[in-house]
Amino acid sequence: VACSSDKPSGDAPATEGAAETVTLRVWGAQDDQEMLQGMIDAFIAANPDTEWDITLGVVSEADAKTKYLEDPAAAADVFAFANDQIIDLVNAGALYKVTRNADDIKARNSEGSIEGSSVDGQLYGYPLTADNGYFLYYDSSVFTKEDVDSLDTMLAKANEAGKKVFMDVSNGWYIASFFLGNGGTFAIDADGNQVVDFNNENGLAAAEAIKAFTADPAFLTGDDSILVAGMGDTIAAGVSGTWNATAMEEALGENYAAAKLPKYTTAAGEVQMGSFVGYKVLGVNSQTKFPEQAMDLADFLSNEENQKLRFETRQLLPSNTVAAAEPAVAENIAIAALQEQNPYGTSQKEVLGTYWAPAEAFGATLEAKDYSIDLQTLLDDMVEQIQTPAGN
């Protein structure tokens, strides 16, 4: 009698009485190893009808694409990656399309995370987190919640208090917030080259705001070490992400606070600063010998329960909408600020490698208060360089 089964067909014994062992390798970040091992053990326990051999290796989300491309056949069957790598991974034929349980995966995760895990409308990954973004940390003994809604107000109050407002403007990741807030866009043309519109009228207005900010006596730039060392002392507010939450809380104590990025002022009015929003995603290697089981494992590792566990263990913002709505998430000051900023965010998926160096150079010029070249020319030069294909 024929009967249906939810079990993957690959679970069927290869020969009568001798089930095939399903061998899978998983890559994850160093800090996730213990947590991932627990999740893998739970997956094996939940699927006792299969003989499993699942091993775990250390490759961070940031390094996943590079490591995969070194030797695709030797890469893990299931691996975590930052979603700004997804176009390159898909173009390299690295990822299996998500063909099992896709509708459920789309329904349970935020729209942004699904878009960030898809290419040309096709889902290629399993969203894990929505935590790769930035927002504003501030000292509540210097600023009120209302103050930090306006960059102008913040700078005025910081100057009164003899304090600094920190932002790494010579970093392309952060400087984009001004352009994105005022309608700037990233796109990829038919030839696979970067297209940006940061030198139009809105881009010039954003650049004027960057110039005014970097010229203000209260402005301070630098890397994370400058922010961490100065917060609560010389620095009263700074733009950063969740990775610095512990250091910020330790520095500020009872004055620890965070919010979305502020608005800046243009001739046309106030503009809410944008940001980049990135997602951590699980992918299944297109060369895996066990695609169905690899998909089931990726599905399990990224489900609601395990996203809650990720938050509890690592304070990583879930992409799962139910997990993200947990009271503990809203009570986490840094995570709540990130959630407040994320609606103004733009996926990094459309950002190519040609963007970063020209944007950094533009920011560095304004940080140095070098006004020898007018802003429009600086913008035109930056955009031309960004849109020049790599290797040209």
Cite the ranges covered by each PLM segment.
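Short, well-ordered beta-strand elements
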Residues: 17-31, 50-57, 77-78, 124, ...
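Extracytoplasmic/periplasmic substrate-binding proteins
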Residues: 29, 214-290
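Extracytoplasmic "Venus flytrap"/periplasmic binding protein-like
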Residues: 42, 46-109, 146, 236-237
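C-terminal capping/gating helix-and-loop segments adjacent to ligand/active sites or protein-protein/ligand interfaces
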Residues: 316, 333-388
